[in-house]
């Protein structure tokens, strides 16, 4: 079709290369002989005669070397090696090769006069608002959670007004993003950058209110599909960890398709044939391969891997929390590449450089620039800290702050605009850094250039208004006033199809990916098989046929118990779908919203592909247990049971997938899952007989899948030959009599009804899963919290809010209220090694140790700020961990002294602080509480409360945290503080310990220029108080680098190559390296840190033939440093070694009190855990109360007792299971904080464990009382004080047992995922041995011992013996009293209650003690 696009002559290209030099267009390979040319010409002539469809799928593949064969190939069968060789020929080494390839593609398109589509994005008077809670109401406390829930409900009914306040994110912004020009989006955190990018890409959250207009080529967003026309590349790296980088790209490419590239190629081939033009064979294959949908080996995938520098890790797993994979920087590039492989024509990229070094960022941005310039692409990219050379690649700049656009237009005029406002960029300052700081209240004054006028703070609003009258602003206003001529929009520019490829291809790709993931997760399936095998073995040996009779109705109860447990085993086996589905949801939401595929395409493959697994799991269960237990020997009945269990397994899998999609996070889904299981379980006909179900709950009986499964499996068994013996005085068989007595449906056809119903549930739940995926979005979006302040000046309020700081006094050196002793640290010939990794031994390495630090020397002094630098892998963090005593493994040699005395880690921990790169804090406390807690535990006992409080206030001012004192810390990337605020909190938490020596690991990583400046100002303030501070730092800007006094530079392999002062404008450092022969001189204005790392690489060493470590050791500087080390290694006259009478600052009791204080706030402000558990308990109590209404007092028949026991058994098992499952993620988060705090010497493990255990006791007590009161009254147990107390006591003990078991499982395993998998096996065994499914007297003698080890068995013993053990009334269907019956049938004696009560205390105590031992003994953090 005329004029369709190769759009982007490939998007692929979309990113590629370097600076511009147009290629002359000569062919890549000149043929070595006329014969080769003739052969190629003949093959090309044959190709030209083919029909268009076939011609576009064929190409001429030339050999890599002269004289090689020339083959005609099918593009869709292009192999991996062919693709690799093709790209090697097209893109040789060097950035400009990418650019040359793009020019060749463009030249081929231009030669036949095809116009490529372009997109101009305009936004006019765009305003975006959110509704947020204000002040203290925004904190997620227990009370607020309940209030907010009630408010939302009442507001929906229009009974109360909305209490949320409007918060403007973007305030009336307008602008144009033009094709063919690279646009950079700059602005401080919370300025609205991400919101603007989302609005322009058509991906804004529906809850946000948007006014104004966004158009593409003059067309409104409703006239095309913006999600497929534009690609939004987000900040968060959301990927499937079990896929490799290449697979991630390949599937993304297959889902997105090729857009209009194929149509463009058709038109291109037609025109070339008409004009008799023969294209370059390699370029021809490249373009055809990029334009062919559905390829498994995609040229685009390999091309983007090459551009992004990901070839080195192409076949490495992406990885996640559980699976080791690629680095953070590589993951960030995968996020970018995933969209670049698609056909989108406009790119909106959000902070794509986080975690990347400046040279990698430069290469990626340069490649994008080449694509944008050559193919007139549209790109708006936000970057955090662009280096000057990267900044200069952009044509246009959009500067945004507080939701207002301050500048938008050519990069060349941006400095001019600020000069008209009176601000000047200093000579050694990057323009990007200047732009981010000049709007900040804290930083603006230093750039004021009008010395004749007094400085006053210029607000963002004033900048925005001034820009409207600036010549660039006026020009943009004029352009926006003229509407875009829609007739000039290329027909292929805007995508109108919802999905990139046809339904058939989408389904095929989705099946392929799901099958791959199932293979990668095969361990889960093997584990489940193993678990089923163990449970099947336990079941068949517990219900052994020699012990089982078929003579009475009591025998029928045992067979019912066995069948019920087999059903439940397969039901619980489906629970693993919950966590596996939730783990993949973030990727699904991202790809669904980007219109990769509809929800049903995602949900269909796991359903169909897991059917064979259901057959295998059911086979494992049925064929092992059937004959050993002694079910009816008919083979037909065996296979009928097998089919039923297959359907049961499928139903459970579908149910838990649906629950996962409805819940969307583990805590909520676990709660939903437990609730669904409870309803189905309690109303399934086993726990509560159908005849006793109240009329208001009978609907629950008829919708319970377990009811259909149970009735079908019982009909299959009890209508068999084994149970056909007639009962005395009755015409009915034993089987029918038993079914009727227990309230089951006594008809053989119920097998077929049950089977059909289960099949229906499988379809229904899978349909529900698909609906939930289609209409629900992910939970937990971060929201702004507005401070509750008088809004007399709205601008001022907004300014304070976005700055996150208020103006403090001038930064002067200051003393602190608490004195401290300055200390120096020296290290001489420090060697650190680890055991040789197994993979290196397998590759033939002879040594048994790998040396990471090779005899490093240095001294860090008070009042001196030292930068610890080096390339990746040089050993920066390793050296810091060794000096700080944070290493948990390896071998350390050498001398380390503190003020001349040998270092002792226990005393050193008291005078040092360590700011880790990952900011680990308890998420549910405020900033102020975090500091109070740290100071409480780390300052000496002599410091009283008032002094401590004053000191905390001083530290908060020093670190600029005063305005954030009541802000909740939150979880990184999810809620609470921003990255930069968390970084300052990390520093403050260490400072309130009043340390003499502070280590900081990457304090500025992941921050924008303004935030980095705030953190560095904090660090500088800290040094100016006379402390010794050492920072590792990665790719700093000039002003950050030159804020340091000294540099400690390591090269790869762990050797120092420069240790000394930087000097004014880094002169000492520059002079040192420039004195080495062959080193390139630094250019004017170039960053000395970047230059220093570039000239000291291993490749430079090889080129110059020198060893920089040896050069340093031969220098005067080294000799001076050795003298300094020698001097500082001698104790000062009259000084004493560090001595503290106790290991920790505070007593054991104080440690316990402080830990408990923090846990109190952590629990109070964690409503997803505490409030949901509370509400869940009330819901379950009301449900049970109404289900078992007034059944507690009925003891006339066995079924009456069975019903009462069922209510207890179900509550103990399910509420307990819910407690254990929900506590595990909470303990797991806090354990990570514990590792940091214990390493800092804040407390011993026991006070922490005590607090974690003790805080649960009141919460669980309230849970037990609430549950007990509601249920006891509604079920109608006997109202005596003793019986009510026993009931509460045993329920409380049971809840505590499960809660502490859940905590113990986390303490003994690396994370809560593994803990939950291990726990599920125990829950199944406890269920089996609880005494409900098979009473203790009926158990084979070889299993009776385990009954006494089962905590659930003791709880049920206590509950039933205390309620019914004293009732001497005779039963209607037995010649025994209630007391005799429960003693004979269940083995329960009232006189044994004292022992039972003791065991009810011992189990929680045992699990709590094991939890404490686990926390103390196991450290799963490897350093």
UniProtKB/Swiss-Prot annotation:
- Organism from which the protein derives: Arabidopsis thaliana (Mouse-ear cress)
For this chain, the family text in UniProt reads:
Belongs to the ABC transporter superfamily. ABCG family. PDR (TC 3.A.1.205) subfamily.
Alphabetical keyword list:
Abscisic acid signaling pathway, ATP-binding, Cell membrane, Glycoprotein, Membrane, Nucleotide-binding, Phosphoprotein, Plant defense, Repeat, Stress response, Transmembrane, Transmembrane helix, Transport
| Description of how the protein assembles with itself and partners | Interacts with LECRK91 and LECRK92.
What InterPro entries does the annotation carry? AAA+_ATPase, ABC2_TM, ABC_trans_N, ABC_transporter-like_ATP-bd, ABCG_dom, ABCG_PDR_2, P-loop_NTPase, PDR_assoc
**Residues at which ATP 2 binds:** 870-877
Per the record, residues carrying Phosphothreonine are: 962
Transmembrane stretches in the record are: 523-543, 562-582, 611-631, 643-663, 667-687, 696-716, 756-776, 1174-1194, 1207-1227, 1257-1277, 1284-1304, 1314-1334, 1341-1361, 1395-1415
Binding residues for ATP 1: 187-194
Reaction(s) the record says it catalyses: abscisate(out) + ATP + H2O = abscisate(in) + ADP + phosphate + H(+)
The name this protein goes by in its record: ABC transporter G family member 40
């Amino acid at each position: 079709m005329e004029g369709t696009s190769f759009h982007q002559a490939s998007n692929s290209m979309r990113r590629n290369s370097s600076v511009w030099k147009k290629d002359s267009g000569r062919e890549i390979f000149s043929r070595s002989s006329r014969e080769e040319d003739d052969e190629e010409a003949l093959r090309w002539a044959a190709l030209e005669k083919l029909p268009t469809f076939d011609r576009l799928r064929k190409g001429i593949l030339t050999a890599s070397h002269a004289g090689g064969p020339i083959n005609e190939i099918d593009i869709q069968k292009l192999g991996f090696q062919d693709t690799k060789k093709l790209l090697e020929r097209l893109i040789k080494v060097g950035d400009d090769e990418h650019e040359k390839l793009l020019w060749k593609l463009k030249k081929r398109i231009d030669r036949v006069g095809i116009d490529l589509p372009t997109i101009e994005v305009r936004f006019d008077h765009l305003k975006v608002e959110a509704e947020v809670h204000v002040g203290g109401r925004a904190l997620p406390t227990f009370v607020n959670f309940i209030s907010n829930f009630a408010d939302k409900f009442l507001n929906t009914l229009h009974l109360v007004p909305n209490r949320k306040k409007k918060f403007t994110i973007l305030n009336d912004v307008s602008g144009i993003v033009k094709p063919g020009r690279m646009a950079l989006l700059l602005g401080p955190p919370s300025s609205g950058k991400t919101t603007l990018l989302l609005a322009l890409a058509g991906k804004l959250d529906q809850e946000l209110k948007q006014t104004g207009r966004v158009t593409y080529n003059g067309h409104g967003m409703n006239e095309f599909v913006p999600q497929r026309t534009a690609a939004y590349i987000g900040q968060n790296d959301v990927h499937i960890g079990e896929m490799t980088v290449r697979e991630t790209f390949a599937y993304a490419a297959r889902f997105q398709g090729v857009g209009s590239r194929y149509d463009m190629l058709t038109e291109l081939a037609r025109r070339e044939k008409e004009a008799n033009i023969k294209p370059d064979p390699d370029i021809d294959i490249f373009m055809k391969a990029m334009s062919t949908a559905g390829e498994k080996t995609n040229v685009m995938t390999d091309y983007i891997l090459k551009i992004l520098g990901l070839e080195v890790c192409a076949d490495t797993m992406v990885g996640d929390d559980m699976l080791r994979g690629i680095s953070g920087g590589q993951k960030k590039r995968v996020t970018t590449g995933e969209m670049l492989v698609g056909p989108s024509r406009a790119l909106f990229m959000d902070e794509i450089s986080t975690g990347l070094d400046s040279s990698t960022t430069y290469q990626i941005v340069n490649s994008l620039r080449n694509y944008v310039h050559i193919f007139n692409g549209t790109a708006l990219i936000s970057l955090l800290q662009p280096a000057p050379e990267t900044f200069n690649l952009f044509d246009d700049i959009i500067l945004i702050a507080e939701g207002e656009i301050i500048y938008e237009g050519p990069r060349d005029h941006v400095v001019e605009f600020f000069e008209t406002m009176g601000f000047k960029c200093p000579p050694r300052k990057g323009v990007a850094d200047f732009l981010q700081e000049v709007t900040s209240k804290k930083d603006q004054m230093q750039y004021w250039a009008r010395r004749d006028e007094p400085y006053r703070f210029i607000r963002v609003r004033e900048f925005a208004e001034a820009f409207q009258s600036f010549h660039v602003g006026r020009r943009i206003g004029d352009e926006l006033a003229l509407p875009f001529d829609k007739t000039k929009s290329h027909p292929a520019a805007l995508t109108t199809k919802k999905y990139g490829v046809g339904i058939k291809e989408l389904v095929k790709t989705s099946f392929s990916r799901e099958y791959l993931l199932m293979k990668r997760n095969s361990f889960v399936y093997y584990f489940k098989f193993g678990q089923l095998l163990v449970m099947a073995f336990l079941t068949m040996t517990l219900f052994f046929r020699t012990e089982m009779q078929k003579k009475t109705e009591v025998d029928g109860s045992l067979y019912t118990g066995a069948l019920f447990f087999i059903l439940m085993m397969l039901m619980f086996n489906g629970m693993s779908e919950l966590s596996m589905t939730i783990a993949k949801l973030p990727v699904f939401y991202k790809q669904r919203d980007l219109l990769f595929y509809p929800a049903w395409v995602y949900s269909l493959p796991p359903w169909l592909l897991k059917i064979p697994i259901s057959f295998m799991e059911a086979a494992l269960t049925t064929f092992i247990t059937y004959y050993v237990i002694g079910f009816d020997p008919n083979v037909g009945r065996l296979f009928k049971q097998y089919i039923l269990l297959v359907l049961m397994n499928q139903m459970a899998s579908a149910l838990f997938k649906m629950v996962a999609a409805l819940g969307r996070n583990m805590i909520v889904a676990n709660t939903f899952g437990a609730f669904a299981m409870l309803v189905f379980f309690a109303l399934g006909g086993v726990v509560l007989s159908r005849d006793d179900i109240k009329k208001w709950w009978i609907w629950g009986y008829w919708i319970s899948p377990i009811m259909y499964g149970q009735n079908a499996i019982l009909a299959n068994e009890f209508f068999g030959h084994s149970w056909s013996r007639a009962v005395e005085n009755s015409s009915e068989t034993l089987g029918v009599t038993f079914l009727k007595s227990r309230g089951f449906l006594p008809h053989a056809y119920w097998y077929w009804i049950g089977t059909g119903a289960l099949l229906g549930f499988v379809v229904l739940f899978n349909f529900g899963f698909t609906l939930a995926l289609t209409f629900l979005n992910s939970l937990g979006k971060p929201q702004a919290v507005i401070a509750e302040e008088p809004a007399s000046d709205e601008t001022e309020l907004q300014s304070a809010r976005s700055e996150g700081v208020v103006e403090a006094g001038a930064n002067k050196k200051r003393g602190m209220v608490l004195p401290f002793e300055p200390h120096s640290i020296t290290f001489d010939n420090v060697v650190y090694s680890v055991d040789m990794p197994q993979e290196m031994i397998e590759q033939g390495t002879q040594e048994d140790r790998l040396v990471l630090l090779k005899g490093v020397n240095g001294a860090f002094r008070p009042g001196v700020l030292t930068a610890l630098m080096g390339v990746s892998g040089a050993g920066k963090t390793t050296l810091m961990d060794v000096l700080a005593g944070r290493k948990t493994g390896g071998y350390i040699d050498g001398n380390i002294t503190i003020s001349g005395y040998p270092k002792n880690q226990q005393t050193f921990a008291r005078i040092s602080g360590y700011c880790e790169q990952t900011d680990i804090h308890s998420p549910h406390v405020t900033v102020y509480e975090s500091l109070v807690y740290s100071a409480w535990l780390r300052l000496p006992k002599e410091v009283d409360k008032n002094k401590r409080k004053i000191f905390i206030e001083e530290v908060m001012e020093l670190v600029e945290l005063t305005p954030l004192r009541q802000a909740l810390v939150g979880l990184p990337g999810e809620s609470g503080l921003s990255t930069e605020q968390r970084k300052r909190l990390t520093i403050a938490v260490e400072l309130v310990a009043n340390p003499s020596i502070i280590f900081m690991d990457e304090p500025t990583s992941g921050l924008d220029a303004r935030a980095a400046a705030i953190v560095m100002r904090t660090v500088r303030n800290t040094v100016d108080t006379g402390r010794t501070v050492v920072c590792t730092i990665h790719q700093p800007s000039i002003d950050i680098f030159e804020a340091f006094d000294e540099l400690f530079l390591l090269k790869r392999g762990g050797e120092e190559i420069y240790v000394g002062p930087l000097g004014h404008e880094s002169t000492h450092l520059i002079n040192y390296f420039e004195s080495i022969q062959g080193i390139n001189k630094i250019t004017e204005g170039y960053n000395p840190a970047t230059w220093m790392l570039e000239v000291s690489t291993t490749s430079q060493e090889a080129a110059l033939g020198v060893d920089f470590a040896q050069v340093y050791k031969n220098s005067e500087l080294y000799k001076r440093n050795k003298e300094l080390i020698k001097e500082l290694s001698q104790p000062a006259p009259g000084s004493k070694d560090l001595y503290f009478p106790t290991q920790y600052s505070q007593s054991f009791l104080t440690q316990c009190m402080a830990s408990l204080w923090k846990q109190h706030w952590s629990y109070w402000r964690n409503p997803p855990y505490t409030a949901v558990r509370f509400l869940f308990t009330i819901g379950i109590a009301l449900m049970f109360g109404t289900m078992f209404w007034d059944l507690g007092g009925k003891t006339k028949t066995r079924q009456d007792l069975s019903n009462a026991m069922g209510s207890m058994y179900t509550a103990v098992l399910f509420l307990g299971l819910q407690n254990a499952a929900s506590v595990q993620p909470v303990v797991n988060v806090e354990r990570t904080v514990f590792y940091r705090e214990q390493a800092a010497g804040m407390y011993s493990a026991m006070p922490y464990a005590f607090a974690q255990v003790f805080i649960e006791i009141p919460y669980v007590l309230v849970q037990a009382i609430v549950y007990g009161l509601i249920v006891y009254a509604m079920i109608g147990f006997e109202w005596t004080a003793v019986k009510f107390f026993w009931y509460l006591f045993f329920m409380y003990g049971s809840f505590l047992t499960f809660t502490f078991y859940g905590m113990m499982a986390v303490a003994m395993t690396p994370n809560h995922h593994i803990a939950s998998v291990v726990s599920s096996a125990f829950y199944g065994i406890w269920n089996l041995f609880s005494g409900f499914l098979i009473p203790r007297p009926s158990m084979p003698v070889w299993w009776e011992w385990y009954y006494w080890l089962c905590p659930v068995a003791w709880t049920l013993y206590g509950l039933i013996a205390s309620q019914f053990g004293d009732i001497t009334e005779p039963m209607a269907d037995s010649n025994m009293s209630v007391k005799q019956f429960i003693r004979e049938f269940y083995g329960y004696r009232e006189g044994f209650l004292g022992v039972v009560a003791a065991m009810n205390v011992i189990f929680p105590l045992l699990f709590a003690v094991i939890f404490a031992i686990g926390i103390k003994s196991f450290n799963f953090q490897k350093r």
